[in-house]
């Protein structure tokens, strides 16, 4: 029995062949063997590699796969853990039967479920106290869903308005309230640099200090440092990504390896991954790093695998 046969049998068992995951790219090279190598190598390494669901957003929005396929997709590509996006099961947060099916799919695939990235539930830094309270309340169902799935965190946004100091005060107030709620579930509330002042590392690290709660943390993203998306092509609309990650790492409970394009040597063209991973390692982080491929030059699966291979090469000194 060769690796190709093992891989195809595994894919059939996970119900992936009908979903298009049995492409030559993924299955032709012995994906199951690649998964075993990654899992074995990752166990003793300083970080392991997970897959953020947003990497496959084009396939999900197109209906080529659905949320329940995600765990199996990640398994075939060699990932040991997954990070969900609430948009892909927005109406299922309180559906215990559905969440249990997600648990079953993840268990069958042999992947861990790490966190849920939550959007569209209101601004935790809204100037209106009542609106902030509604936003906190809206996130409760995602805390419950994350608990049901065995996740360690939900990722939220710190959107606000006003002056620098006003936004820090408002965002920290909403986050602290949510952290107090999350404490009962044993879950963390982590904030990503995700536009506006949240993409300013100094501002967001200041928010963390103001919240001053053991359940709060950051999810530094290698690429999300645009302060004004309406001026995305202008240099001064961007915060220095290396400085930003360095400022956010002391509070990190997860890390996102954003990628868009690669050169002929497999290096990401917009981010110096060696430099970025050194910042992450020097901060003392020892956990999962999530691949989030957002480019258009490669198929979503191919881009995700390319990012994973780049992380492995640097991590393993290859």
Q: Residue spans of the language-model regions?
A:
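C-terminal segment of N-terminal export signals and the immediately downstream linker at the start
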Residues: 27-54, 60
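Acidic (Asp/Glu)-rich catalytic clusters
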Residues: 39-46, 71-76, 94-114, 140-148, ...
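Non-membrane alpha-helical structural segments and their capping/turn regions in soluble enzymes
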Residues: 64, 68, 96, 100, ...
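C-terminal helical cap(s) of enzyme catalytic domains, especially alpha/beta-barrels
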Residues: 301-316
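Acidic/histidine-rich helix-loop elements
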Residues: 54-64, 128-130, 227-234
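Acidic/histidine-rich catalytic cores of soluble enzymes
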Residues: 46, 81-82, 172-279
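N-terminal export signals
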Residues: 2-4, 10-33
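Structural motif corresponding to the early beta-alpha repeats
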Residues: 80-176, 183-188, 224, 229, ...
């Amino acid at each position: 029995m060769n690796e190709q046969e093992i891989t195809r049998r595994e894919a059939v068992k996970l119900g992936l062949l009908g979903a298009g995951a049995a492409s030559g790219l993924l299955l032709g090279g012995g994906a199951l063997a690649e998964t075993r190598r990654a899992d074995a190598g990752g166990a003793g390494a300083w970080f392991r590699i997970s897959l953020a669901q947003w990497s496959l957003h084009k396939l999900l929005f197109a209906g080529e796969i659905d949320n329940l396929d995600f765990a199996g997709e990640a398994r075939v590509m060699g990932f040991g853990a997954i990070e969900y996006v609430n948009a892909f099961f927005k109406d299922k947060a309180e559906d215990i039967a559905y969440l249990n099916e997600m648990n079953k799919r993840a268990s069958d695939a042999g992947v861990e479920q790490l966190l849920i990235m939550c959007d569209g539930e209101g601004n935790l830094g809204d100037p209106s106290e009542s609106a902030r309270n509604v936003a906190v309340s809206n996130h409760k169902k995602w805390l419950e869903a994350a608990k049901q799935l065995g996740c360690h965190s939900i990722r939220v946004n710190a959107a606000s308005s006003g002056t620098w100091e006003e936004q820090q005060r408002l965002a920290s107030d909403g986050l602290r309230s949510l952290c107090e709620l999350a404490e009962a579930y044993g879950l963390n509330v982590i904030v990503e640099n995700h536009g506006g002042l949240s993409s300013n590392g100094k501002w967001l690290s200041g928010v963390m200090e103001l919240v001053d709660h053991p359940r709060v943390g950051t999810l530094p993203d290698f690429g999300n440092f645009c302060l004004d998306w309406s001026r995305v092509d202008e240099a001064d609309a961007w915060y220095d990504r290396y400085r930003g990650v360095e400022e956010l790492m002391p509070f990190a409970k997860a890390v996102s390896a954003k990628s868009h394009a690669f050169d002929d040597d497999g290096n990401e063209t917009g981010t110096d991954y060696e430099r970025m991973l050194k910042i992450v390692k020097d901060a003392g982080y020892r956990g999962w790093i999530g691949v989030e491929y957002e480019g258009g030059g490669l198929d979503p699966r191919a881009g995700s695998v390319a990012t994973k291979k780049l992380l492995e090469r640097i991590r393993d000194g290859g």
